[in-house]
Design a protein with these regions (language model features):
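Repeated loop/turn-to-beta-strand initiation elements of outer-membrane beta-barrel proteins
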Residues: 44-49, 74-81, 116-123, 147-156, ...
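Bacterial Sec-dependent N-terminal signal peptides
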Residues: 1-20
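Hydrophobic/aromatic-rich structural module bridging two neighboring secondary-structure elements via a short loop
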Residues: 60-110
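Outer-membrane beta-barrel transmembrane domain signature
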Residues: 127-189, 193-200, 206, 216-218
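Short glycine/proline- and aromatic-enriched beta-strand/turn motifs that initiate or cap beta-hairpins
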Residues: 18-57
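Residues that define the transmembrane beta-barrel architecture of outer-membrane proteins
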Residues: 30-34, 62-66, 101-107, 135-141, ...
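Residues on the lipid-exposed face of transmembrane beta-strands in outer-membrane beta-barrel proteins
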Residues: 36-40, 68-72, 107-115, 126-128, ...
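Transmembrane beta-barrel strands of outer-membrane/channel proteins
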Residues: 23-25, 49-53, 83-87, 124-128, ...
Length: 218
């Protein structure tokens, strides 16, 4: 689970905040990833943030990625205003030396629509994406969903992103991460995800990368 550009997973909760910690084993890339997610609604909308760490360096963490999003929406507004920031950094090894890199800062400004209840829900937004050092205007469209089955014993959730990186006529990126969880109880779940991507993170073409994971609902 290597979310380099974006992730936006909102669980529609009436009056409660929610946070969870996930530990994933990525079989293709042969490393662990941890994810911490936090979601909190209020009378003016909701705030979502998460941070990913990849453990692919000999000494520990090889990459960190951070995202925070705010939806401004009251009960009288059918559509919310979406503001989001993405960014991160990482390390790599080459010829016995260690180097570093940054993931270009990105801001997204758009409109959000969400609908759901205790059993199912979805959220979607579309907006203008300003990527640092990109010479052209970009866009991003995101959809997230959740579905609770068999009296909440099974949860199917995830997201799908589509965005441009250098204007409308050049590189278009797709990333989706559907997750399936078996809920042992209210605190712990076992499951995993499949990262489905096209032209993502410097790779050309399509990839399918499965993980096995455990989730702790805090």
């Amino acid at each position: 689970m290597n979310k380099i550009i974006t992730l936006f997973t909102i669980f529609i909760t009436a009056n409660l905040s929610a946070q969870n910690f996930q530990l994933h084993r990525d079989f293709e890339r042969d490393h662990f990833t941890t994810t911490f997610e936090f979601f909190k609604p209020d009378k003016y909308g909701n705030t979502f943030t998460f941070i990913d760490f990849d453990y692919n360096a000999k000494s520990g963490i090889s990459q960190g990625y951070y995202e925070i999003a705010r939806v401004l929406k009251t009960e009288k507004m059918p559509i919310g205003l979406h503001v989001e920031y993405n960014g991160g950094l990482g390390t790599f090894e080459a010829n016995g030396a260690q180097g570093g890199y940054t993931i270009n800062d990105a801001w997204i400004f758009g409109l959000n629509y969400a609908k759901g209840n205790a059993n199912w829900g979805f959220s979607t937004y579309a907006g203008y994406k300003a990527i640092k050092n990109s010479g052209k205007a970009n866009y991003q469209v995101t959809g997230t969903w959740y579905l609770n089955l068999f009296k909440d014993k099974l949860t199917f959730n995830g997201f799908a992103d589509l965005w441009s990186e250098n204007g409308l006529s050049e590189r278009t990126v797709f990333l989706a991460e559907p997750q399936l969880w078996y809920n042992l109880n209210k605190s712990f779940s076992l499951g995993g995800e499949v990262e489905i991507s096209s032209n993502f993170a410097g790779f050309t073409g399509s990839y399918f990368r499965p993980t096995l994971a455990i989730k702790w609902n805090i």
